[in-house]
Amino acid sequence: MENGLRAARREMKMKKFCLVLIAILLSVLSCAVKGHTSDAEGKNGRSAPVLHFGTLPVLQALPLFVAAEKGYFKTQGVTVDLVLFNSAMEKDVALSSGQISGYFGDLMTPMILAANKIPVKMAATIYNTTARQRMFAILAASKTANKGLDEIVQAGIAGSSNTIIEYLMARLLASKNIPASKLNMIEVKSIPIRLQMLLSDQVPAAGLPEPLVTLAEMKGARVLLDDAGPGLSATVLAFRNEFLNSRPATVRAFLAAVAKASAYVNRNPDDVRSIMNRECKVPEPLQQTFPIPVFPKLTLPASSQVMDVYRWLREKRIVKTEMTLQQMVADGYLP
């Protein structure tokens, strides 16, 4: 445990260094975006509008990668530059600075950005959990295999405070009548480090996303709770208000292409496995067997989910601004 806590503290000391790296990243990204825009010039010599859209190498973003590879964005008449980030923090900074006009992510970030006077709205839900597919779980390390959930919660769960991870942990524990006040959060913001600490018994338990949940199970960890069924883990497509207002046709075309890609994934799961493995960073041991996610029809984010996350943010005093559903969700753009 002491080794695990030392590793977590070392990670916290890296924060200032990470901020410097993000500043460098934004400088590089600015050059990259400009170069890509010039490539989109039409035959008349005038630059075609480009939607710079931020995403992460995760399973829920698969339709974005499929739409790009299958040419669906082009078919819909929209030029899209998918800007890939390795962390949500990098993506959020890029959105805040205007380097990207839209992004893929959880329900929480748009609310935090909007509360900090960066006008962003969610236009569609691209993925949600069902009874047959999970996306997040709390797992116990092999050394805690004989301990009960209450004991493990108090011993400590590796995760990240004030993030969607903590929200999911709180809601999953509440489903077992365990109040969030009992949770001993061990701060480990890096997901790969969290996985490593779990598998090396440096922490009693950890919160992880798929496909790392399945990988951890293969290596001896035990799933205590997961989000299959409750529909807690919606991921959304969000845009800056300025872009929504000035380029509504581009947003609709983008969402139409994503909807087409989602349907293609559902009809042809074997055909997209190679794209998933490559773009969503599926670990090698799982590349032939991990189930291809099933994607729902694009819908507006469910008001119950949006408001539950918002209330949690208010309770935690992460968001201190009062907002309505209409200030967080943009209607009228779905295909």
Region spans (language model):
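Pocket-lining segment of extracytoplasmic ligand-binding domains
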Residues: 108, 185, 192-278
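Secondary-structure end/capping motifs
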Residues: 245-320
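Short, glycine-/small- and polar/acidic-enriched structural segments
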Residues: 41-179, 185-188, 204-208, 222-223, ...
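Ligand-binding clefts/hinges and TM-proximal coupling segments of bilobed small-molecule sensing domains
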Residues: 32-35, 159-178, 257-287, 326-329
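Short, low-complexity disordered leader/linker segments with a strong preference
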Residues: 1-48
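Soluble non-cytosolic domains of exported or imported proteins
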Residues: 58, 85-89, 104, 159, ...
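Conserved C-terminal helix/tail region of periplasmic/extracytoplasmic solute-binding proteins
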Residues: 314-335
